[in-house]
């Protein structure tokens, strides 16, 4: 071969012009050459463009039917059959409405946001998260108790939209098709039946502030969060196609419903029913808009949440199923952790019942299951990584009740 002076025989990359001595490899094509550095650069460009295409196609490629949405929810959420059916239909109709708006149809379908009522730990947040994951849309959670109306110490309602924007990597189009779950919405109920002349900055005022973004408006969002100030530049976000799901335990609402139901049963023509103890979920299932207004939600706010899904209180059997049946069940999660240590973890049926019973005793629902298991397994999770030849760990009822230690099975064959 000749030298670097452009004489025949000396090969150069057809893209960057570097000579064969300046690169590690040159790949030959018909009358062209490409070096290893240009190949790496091309790979990066292709990967970046593929990512941009994926982002542009955010959202489901085909909107799942209500039955398909419910089937997906069944994989992660145990029980709550009626609530899952209501949510599946509501979410399907919402995104059909979004598609129709984009197609420019002249018939306007009004937005239907969702209100979920149910005891603590019954699965409200998990349902909302699972829906967003299934539909491949950005998702944000806000705590209503942190919100105050504009001008008071606390968080502006627009910061909820900022959380969604951040979840969408500041992609405006994606964010405007997302889902926002507002938790503890019962805590912003008005403190009395009649409007107060004093300011209720974390109650009725917040409901009023939420009204516009929930029904659909162009919100001015501070890009870095915090309070608004005149010198700041704002991001304009259209909330018309954002699905809002509000949730809360609504403790005390059952009394309002019972009171209303009781007045209807008075008089000679009243139907006499046999008295039986009703669960909180059964009572909440009879919720009417007027009950929510009496509880402390303003009529306009109730009107923006036309779809109401009530969740039942979880019993022991449901909690045991939650521990072992869903795709990401707690038992499977802990078994995976131990599997990484090459140890098989087994929970006896008695242990699972004991965990469920303790959660019921604490009145924490499914939310308290993890802390009970963590507490019971702290010592064994501390010791196992330092021990050799451990084959299996068995967690029984006594371990959960702090009355015994886990059974550890060693691999004798390995020590022989």
From Swiss-Prot:
Superkingdom of the source species: Bacteria
Binding-site list for Zn(2+): 13, 16, 35, 38
Gene Ontology MF terms in the entry: ATP binding; ATP hydrolysis activity; ATP-dependent protein folding chaperone; protein dimerization activity; unfolded protein binding; zinc ion binding
Domain ClpX-type ZB: 1-54
Any one Gene Ontology cellular component term annotated for this protein: HslUV protease complex
Gene Ontology BP terms: cell division; proteolysis involved in protein catabolic process
Family of the protein in this entry: Belongs to the ClpX chaperone family.
Its job: ATP-dependent specificity component of the Clp protease. It directs the protease to specific substrates. Can perform chaperone functions in the absence of ClpP.
Protein name stated in the entry: ATP-dependent Clp protease ATP-binding subunit ClpX
Gene: clpX
């Amino acid at each position: 071969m000749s030298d670097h002076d452009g004489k025949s025989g000396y090969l150069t990359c057809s893209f960057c012009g570097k000579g064969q001595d300046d690169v590690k490899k040159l790949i030959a094509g018909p009358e062209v050459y490409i070096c290893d550095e240009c190949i790496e650069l091309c790979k990066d460009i292709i990967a970046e463009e593929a990512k941009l295409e994926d982002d542009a196609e955010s959202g489901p490629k085909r909107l799942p039917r209500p039955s398909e949405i419910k089937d997906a929810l069944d994989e992660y959420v145990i029980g709550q059959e009626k609530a899952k059916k209501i949510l599946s239909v509501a979410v399907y109709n919402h995104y059909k409405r979004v598609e129709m708006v984009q197609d420019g149809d002249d018939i306007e379908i009004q937005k239907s946001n969702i209100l979920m009522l149910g005891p603590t730990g019954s699965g409200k947040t998990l349902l909302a998260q699972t829906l967003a994951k299934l539909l491949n849309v950005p998702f944000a959670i806000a705590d209503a108790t942190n919100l105050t109306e504009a001008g008071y110490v606390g968080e502006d309602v627009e910061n909820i939209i900022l959380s969604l924007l951040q979840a969408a990597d500041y992609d405006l189009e994606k964010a405007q098709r997302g889902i926002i779950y507002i938790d503890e919405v019962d805590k912003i109920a008005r403190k009395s039946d009649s409007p107060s002349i004093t300011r209720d900055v974390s109650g009725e005022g917040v409901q009023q502030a939420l009204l516009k973004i929930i029904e659909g408006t162009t919100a001015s969002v501070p890009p870095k969060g915090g309070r608004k100030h005149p010198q700041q530049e704002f991001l304009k976000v259209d909330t018309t196609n954002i699905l809002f799901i509000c949730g809360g335990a609504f403790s005390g609402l059952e009394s309002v419903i019972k009171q209303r139901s009781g007045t209807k049963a008075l008089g000679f023509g009243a139907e006499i029913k046999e008295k039986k103890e009703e669960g909180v979920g059964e009572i909440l299932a009879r919720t009417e808009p007027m009950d929510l207004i009496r509880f402390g939600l303003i009529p306009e706010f109730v009107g923006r949440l036309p779809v109401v899904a009530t969740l039942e209180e979880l019993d022991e059997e449901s909690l045991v199923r939650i521990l072992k049946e869903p795709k990401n069940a707690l038992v499977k999660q802990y078994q995976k952790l131990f599997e990484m240590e090459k140890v098989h973890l087994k929970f006896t049926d008695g242990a699972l019942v004991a965990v469920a019973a303790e959660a019921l005793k604490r009145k924490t629902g499914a939310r308290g299951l993890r802390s009970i298991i963590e507490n019971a397994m702290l010592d064994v999770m501390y010791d196992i990584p330092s021990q050799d030849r451990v084959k299996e760990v068995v967690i029984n009822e006594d371990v959960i009740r702090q009355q015994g230690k886990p059974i550890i099975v060693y691999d004798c064959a390995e020590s022989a």
